[in-house]
């Protein structure tokens, strides 16, 4: 619970512009981990140079951050939010668990820069995401997805 609160202290800066911050997160993810772009077939027609300014990338990034905000605000009581997300990410998108770890590291960096997330908050975000990823892993196992 305390970890969620540490992260939520800075969440207002993220909420203030979900599209810009979400676009930043996804673009950094694609730049730092180019293989992750393959998980987003709807961006396949966008050249690497045009990804940064793409409204589609920003919109999807906003969706990601809004869902993360819901998970943070649930403060660990997130089964109703997380189970359907795990289901779609396993059955439709085929997202391996490691990709959630990769985006976590990008989130930590972006929140440090854009929202003032300090070292304690960064550790808190990593711990929260570790718990979320652990729960996703449990759901993946339930449905037989080797993520």
Curated annotation (Swiss-Prot):
Protein name: Myoglobin
Binding annotation for nitrite: 60
PROSITE patterns attached to this UniProt entry: GLOBIN (PS01033)
Catalytic activity: Fe(III)-heme b-[protein] + nitric oxide + H2O = Fe(II)-heme b-[protein] + nitrite + 2 H(+); H2O2 + AH2 = A + 2 H2O
Pfam families: Globin
Positions that bind O2: 60
Signal peptide bounds: none
Domain Globin: 2-141
Domain of life: Eukaryota
Quaternary structure note: Monomeric.
Positions of heme b binding: 89
PANTHER family in UniProt: MYOGLOBIN
Annotated compartments: Cytoplasm, Sarcoplasm
Catalytic EC class: oxidoreductase
Keyword ATP-binding: no
Family: Belongs to the globin family.
């Amino acid at each position: 619970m305390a970890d969620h609160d540490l992260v939520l202290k800075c969440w207002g800066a993220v909420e203030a512009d979900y599209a810009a911050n979400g676009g930043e997160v996804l673009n950094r993810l694609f730049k730092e981990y180019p293989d992750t772009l393959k998980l987003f077939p709807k961006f396949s027609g966008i050249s690497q140079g045009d990804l940064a300014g793409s409204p589609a990338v920003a919109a999807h990034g906003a969706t990601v951050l809004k869902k993360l905000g819901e998970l943070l605000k649930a403060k660990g009581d997130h089964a109703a939010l997380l189970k359907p997300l795990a289901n779609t990410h396993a059955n439709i998108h085929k997202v391996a668990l490691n990709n959630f770890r990769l985006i976590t590291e990008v989130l930590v960096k972006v929140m440090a820069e854009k929202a003032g997330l300090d070292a304690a908050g960064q550790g808190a975000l990593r711990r929260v995401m570790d718990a979320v990823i652990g729960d996703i892993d449990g759901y993946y196992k339930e449905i037989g997805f080797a993520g």
